[in-house]
From Swiss-Prot:
Homology family: Belongs to the peroxidase family. Classical plant (class III) peroxidase subfamily.
Binding annotation for heme b: H199
GO BP, one annotated term: flower development
Amino-acid positions noted as binding Ca(2+) 1 in the UniProt annotation, renumbered to this chain: D73, V76, G78, D80, S82
Species whose genome carries this gene: Arabidopsis thaliana
Major location (coarse): secreted
The organism's taxonomic lineage, starting at the top: Eukaryota, Viridiplantae, Streptophyta, Embryophyta, Tracheophyta
Keyword annotations of the record: Calcium, Disulfide bond, Glycoprotein, Heme, Hydrogen peroxide, Iron, Metal-binding, Oxidoreductase, Peroxidase, Pyrrolidone carboxylic acid, Secreted, Signal
Bound cofactor: record note: Binds 2 calcium ions per subunit. Binds 1 heme b (iron(II)-protoporphyrin IX) group per subunit.
The protein's Enzyme Commission number: 1.11.1.7
Disulfide bonds: C41-C121, C74-C79, C127-C329, C206-C238
Protein name per the record: Peroxidase 53
Length: 335
């Protein structure tokens, strides 16, 4: 997975950026509402949920994959379904970006959802709203919280490959870099920890954590924050010069359930990804107290996660006459 660190900026620039971004979000997100499709496609949420239920019968990973698509979409020019666009003569697909290539998945299920929605309500529900609805349904179906999904997003007319390479947080980045990337889109530290809790289900490839197993940060030794028992298991699964595509569970204890075990894992140094473990192992970080509170109180985590998903879904949506309602999520209309 490619890692591109954002250039360092002085504090005044960062504060100004956050103020500007926050003011934009306040205007855009206010146009989203929970009843947007009540008169035009009242069964939209039920259609999304039933399609995912069907997909789960043959792919237990699909819920985690769908929420990851929403996350990677929102961090690049906002929640506009740009991640779903294929390459064309004029569009460089975000699917080819380092954080997405050979790892982003679930596009076929998005297409199935969109087909079902088009059959019921032609030209009404946007692909960006499909991702938002699919994320809520995926979490709920895995035993996690439900929340009111705000709707009314429209779809982008292009993609941003460079933005996908630079803006999406990487599992091998430092906590400070990831915190900056969250701040750049108007999300705070509580959002960072809560949304990281989505790693309570799903899988990860050896290629995104094998940097911790043998030669961490050029030391010639494994990551010292990695539990020795887990380290031994992972070294066997992902040997040096082995396949980077081998997958394992993000949460070893309850891999397909949405719960707060992810945070307990961090407390015992059983976080799979560097970016996860740093939430608890970075000395003096404010994230430690948040991890501790979520580990001891699942209800608190669920409440925070639901709110943070709403916050993330409010990142720079296209509304009104901006963008379009794609008829096929893979391509802009008329192409």
């Amino acid at each position: 997975m490619a890692v591109t660190n954002l250039p360092t900026c002085d504090g005044l620039f960062i504060i100004s950026l956050i103020v500007i971004v926050s003011s934009i979000f306040g205007t855009s997100s206010a146009q989203l509402n929970a009843t947007f499709y009540s008169g035009t496609c009242p069964n939209a949420s039920a259609i999304v949920r039933s399609t995912i239920q069907q997909a789960l019968q043959s792919d237990t990973r699909i819920g985690a994959s769908l929420i990851r698509l929403h996350f990677h979409d929102c961090f690049v020019n906002g929640c506009d379904a740009s991640i779903l666009l294929d390459d064309t003569g004029s569009i460089q697909s975000e699917k080819n970006a380092g954080p997405n290539v050979n790892s982003a998945r679930g596009f076929n299920v998005v297409d199935n959802i969109k087909t079902a929605l088009e059959n019921a309500c032609p030209g009404v529900v946007s692909c960006s709203d499909v991702l938002a609805l699919a994320s809520e349904a995926s979490v709920s179906l895995a035993g996690g919280p439900s929340w009111t999904v705000l709707l009314g997003r429209r779809d982008s007319l292009t993609a941003n490959l460079a933005g996908a390479n630079s803006s999406i947080p990487s599992p091998i980045e430092s906590l400070s870099n990831i915190t900056f990337k969250f701040s750049a889109v108007g999300l705070n530290t509580n959002d960072l920890v809560a949304l990281s809790g989505a790693h309570t289900f799903g899988r990860a490839r050896c290629g995104v954590f094998n940097n911790r197993l043998f030669n961490f940060s050029g030391t010639g030794n494994p990551d010292p924050t990695l539990n020795s028992t887990l380290l031994s298991t992972l070294q066997q699964l992902c040997p040096q010069n082995g396949s980077a595509s081998t997958i394992t569970n993000l949460d070893l204890s309850t891999p397909d359930a949405f719960d707060n075990n992810y945070f307990a894992n961090l407390q015992s140094n059983d976080g799979l990804l560097q970016s996860d473990q740093e939430l608890f192992s970075t000395t003096g970080s404010s994230t430690i107290a948040i991890v501790t509170s979520f580990a001891s109180n699942q209800t608190l985590f669920f409440q925070a996660f639901a709110q943070s998903m709403i916050n993330m879904g409010n990142i720079s949506p296209l509304t009104g006459s901006n963008g379009e309602i794609r008829l096929d999520c893979k391509k802009v209309n008329g192409s």
